[in-house]
């Protein structure tokens, strides 16, 4: 299980948040910083918390192929996370073109409408577990 802490909410003091991450890790629950890069978190947040996962916000992906700065940010974050053993999910994958560009930076997970629209619990169970689940 992975709990996501959204970037748009104001964090506790980093030391308190590190304790929260440690508590959940001891219970076998992983934490992810969601929408990374658009709110309060910074490289210092990564250094202090060393979260098991970050999810790069879709806004950096939307203009990939047109805006070199956004692609450079994604490349930088993925390189940093690879070197520090932080897993990365890139949000906002909506086309084959975007998928091809992002894949060359080797994120652990990809998320977006290219793969599926959001599903209800019943639709998810039918699709991935089988009818009648």
What are these regions (language model features)?
Residues 19-27, 76:
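Catalytic-core regions built around general acid/base machinery
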Residues 1-14, 29-133:
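EAL-family c-di-GMP phosphodiesterase catalytic domain
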């Amino acid at each position: 299980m992975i709990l996501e802490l959204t970037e748009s909410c104001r964090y506790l003091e980093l030391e308190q948040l590190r304790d929260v991450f440690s508590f959940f890790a001891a219970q076998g629950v992983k934490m992810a910083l969601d929408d990374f890069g658009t709110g309060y978190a910074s490289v210092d947040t990564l250094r202090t918390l060393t979260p098991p996962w970050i999810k790069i916000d879709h806004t950096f992906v939307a203009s990939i192929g047109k805006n070199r700065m956004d692609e450079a940010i994604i490349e930088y974050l993925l390189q940093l996370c690879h070197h520090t053993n932080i897993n990365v999910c890139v949000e906002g994958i909506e086309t084959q073109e975007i998928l091809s560009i992002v894949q060359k930076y080797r994120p652990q997970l990809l998320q977006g409408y290219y793969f599926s629209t959001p599903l209800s619990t019943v639709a998810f169970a039918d699709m991935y577990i089988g009818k009648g689940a």
